[in-house]
Amino acid sequence: MSFTSSSNNERERWNQKYLEAAGAETWTVPDPFLARAFSGYILPLFPHPGSALDLAGGAGRHAIWLAKQGWEVTLIDVSDAGVEQARQNAGPLASHMHFVVDDLTHFKASQTEFETAFEVVMAFFYLEREIFPEMVQAVRPGGLLVYKTYTLAQAKLAGGPKNPAHLLAPGELLQLADGLRVLHYCEEVTEKATAELVARKEK
């Protein structure tokens, strides 16, 4: 792994967040969308557990949940503190998981610490538009991309990011997923303003 000065700053910023709020519900309780995506799309397509990639997985709340369903999960995050918490939170499941500290702003599916594509690639509340094609490349033919993050409407709500660079415009996620077959898409504003997607990479 290698870090630029900017990614070092990002790593330190997230390290501080994880260390200050270790064990907080924010880092340990999975977003309900994962369970819905699993029962509605992942399980029907893959009744036998496969391999999954969790990008910007932090302390492992989504990776660990999927590992509990029998899946082999690789988690990548820029924060070594977050990844170490994920390893600890996983407990015995850690033996069936892979933990990678790396700068995702330069993520290349062909250069990571794995050799095959994944049945499921997921990312929650992480937006790096430039690597979206690499995320899609990491999905094996017939596999799924499961994605959820904030939209521009979040700027007017409490919490979450306010920088437009970290917020999706209306319909933007569908554009980013162009070329995939969309199975589920929803934009909504409740306590958070989010867009969520399940899309399949055709064979």
Residue ranges and their predicted role:
Residues 1-58:
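Conserved class I S-adenosyl-L-methionine
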Residues 79-81:
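Conserved SAM/SAH-binding beta-strand->alpha-helix loop
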Residues 86-87:
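Conserved SAM-binding loop
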Residues 93-106:
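Conserved SAM-binding strand-loop segment of SAM-dependent methyltransferases
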Residues 109-120:
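A short acidic, Gly/Pro-enriched loop at the edge of an enzyme's catalytic core
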Residues 127-136:
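A short, conserved alpha-helix within the catalytic core of class I
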Residues 143-150:
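Conserved beta-strand signature within the Rossmann-like core of class I S-adenosyl-L-methionine
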